[in-house]
């Protein structure tokens, strides 16, 4: 249902901050011959944590402490969802996209959780750590929460403990709603969520302010949600390397959706090193279909000659990842996301003067011009490609002239929809954007330009490289 999707999807936006975080960082130095147009991203000290405790916090935790009262949620949405996580108690029968927590006043509420963002179905199975790629943010959902307000009032009234437990979530969702509209399904409007919440929070004690302190541009810039299993290699968060310092602190800002003040932020922050430790333990899923091993071996040679200086090496024991930021003229991909944090500095100025930037484990937001060349572990599972999800298959990524300007897929994420030849999603080429399920790569922010490095390869080398990428 639209309401269910929107509630869970807002957490998808909020917790995308986790998509590039990790508990420890590699101390790999850039190798000699680092490509021109790149900058090495230095590591930062990180806190350790208990991975198992982190997983329990992930599937039961109250980092979002306000939501729909449990009886209302069950009445409207039911409680017979598949048992994807094996949870017990109140969470049994609730979608993996939500947690059931006890609000500060004792009311049980259903809240969105990290897995709204960082879990997705692939071939019929929920893969924890795979970025969501099916969500639809193309309609303005602020009115949905106005309707939810009426439902909670009808059940309990505005003077009830249930309304008190629900209202902080409703208030935040309605503030965010106008800023998270996208023009195509499947992409994520994460660039605006934290900026909007920050505009409604005092920097020092983080309490809510009804009126915005600074203006936030209305237009959302699309992103593709990265996979969690890449995190263990990263030195910086976000596609443009914006997030520096303590990743647990940076990631704990997801609590800004509903937290009361900095005291609650501190409680959440104390638990996030455990969650980071669990995220760091994840491994990429293996390609589940046959691989031509001889062809893949030839592709490894192509990869290490043409790709490894930016994306790393994957042949143990020589595995390494260089942590490079590639400047815009070099990579050539759509520049809008990178430019966004430079064209309106109010958000990172707020953050760098806020509670989150204080103490021994502070975070910082340092805008860069360019994009991080990501690790490629499990790349077969992470279609569509580029930072904005504009390219449906790896074959299209490696041969830019064949990238479709308009393309459409089913969003079923079943085996029947997976293209084992081109490695990615089966799609139809369209002549225009007739509906939200059609990706329009002609729009600013959505363009499929750049990363043309595969164009110079022969057809035989591209085929071999494609086979090798299945093995990562």
What residue spans do the PLM features occupy?
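Periplasmic c-type cytochrome electron-transfer domains
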Residues: 22-472
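Bacterial N-terminal signal peptides that target proteins for export
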Residues: 1-10
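C-terminal motif of bacterial Sec signal peptides marking the signal peptidase cleavage site
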Residues: 17-20
């Amino acid at each position: 249902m639209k309401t269910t999707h929107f509630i869970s999807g807002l957490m998808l936006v909020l917790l995308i901050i986790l998509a590039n975080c990790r508990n420890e960082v590699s101390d790999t130095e850039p190798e000699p011959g680092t490509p021109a147009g790149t900058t090495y991203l230095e590591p930062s000290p990180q806190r350790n944590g208990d991975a198992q405790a982190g997983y329990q916090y992930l599937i039961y935790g109250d980092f979002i402490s306000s939501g729909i009262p449990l009886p209302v949620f069950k009445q409207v949405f039911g409680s017979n969802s598949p048992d994807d996580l094996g949870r017990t108690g109140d969470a049994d029968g609730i979608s993996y996209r939500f947690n059931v927590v006890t609000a500060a006043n004792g009311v049980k509420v259903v809240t969105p959780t990290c897995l709204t963002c960082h879990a997705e179905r692939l071939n019929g199975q929920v893969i924890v750590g795979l970025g969501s790629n099916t969500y639809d943010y193309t309609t303005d959902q602020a009115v949905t929460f106005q309707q939810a307000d009426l439902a909670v009032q009808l059940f309990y009234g505005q003077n009830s403990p249930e309304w008190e437990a629900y209202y902080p979530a409703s208030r935040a969702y309605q503030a965010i709603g106008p800023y998270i509209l996208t023009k195509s399904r499947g992409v994520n409007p994460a660039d605006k969520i934290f900026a909007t919440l920050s505009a409604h929070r005092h920097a020092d004690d983080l309490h809510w302010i009804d009126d915005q302190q600074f203006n936030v541009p209305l237009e959302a810039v699309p992103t593709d949600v990265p996979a969690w299993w890449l995190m263990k290699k990263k030195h910086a968060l976000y596609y443009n390397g914006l997030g520096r310092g303590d990743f647990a602190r940076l990631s704990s800002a997801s609590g800004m959706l509903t937290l009361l003040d900095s005291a609650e932020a501190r409680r959440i922050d104390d638990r996030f090193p455990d969650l980071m430790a669990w995220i760091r333990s994840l491994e990429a899923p293996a390609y589940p279909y046959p691989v031509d091993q001889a062809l893949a071996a030839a592709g490894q040679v192509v990869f290490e000659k043409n790709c490894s200086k930016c994306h790393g090496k994957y042949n143990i024991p020589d595995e390494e990842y260089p942590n490079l930021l590639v400047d815009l003229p070099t990579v050539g991909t759509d520049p809008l996301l990178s430019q966004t944090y430079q064209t309106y500095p109010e958000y990172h100025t707020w953050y760098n003067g806020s509670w989150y930037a204080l103490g021994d484990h502070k975070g910082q937001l340092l805008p860069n011009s360019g994009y991080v060349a990501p690790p490629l572990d499990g790349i077969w599972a992470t279609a569509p490609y580029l930072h904005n999800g504009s390219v449906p298959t790896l074959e299209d990524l490696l041969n830019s002239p064949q990238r479709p300007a308009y393309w459409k897929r089913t969003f079923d994420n079943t085996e029947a929809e997976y293209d084992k030849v081109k490695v990615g999603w089966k799609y139809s080429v369209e002549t225009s954007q007739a509906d939200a399920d059609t990706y329009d790569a002609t729009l600013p922010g959505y363009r499929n330009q750049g990363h043309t490095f595969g164009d110079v390869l022969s057809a035989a080398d591209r085929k071999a490289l494609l086979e090798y990428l299945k093995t990562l």
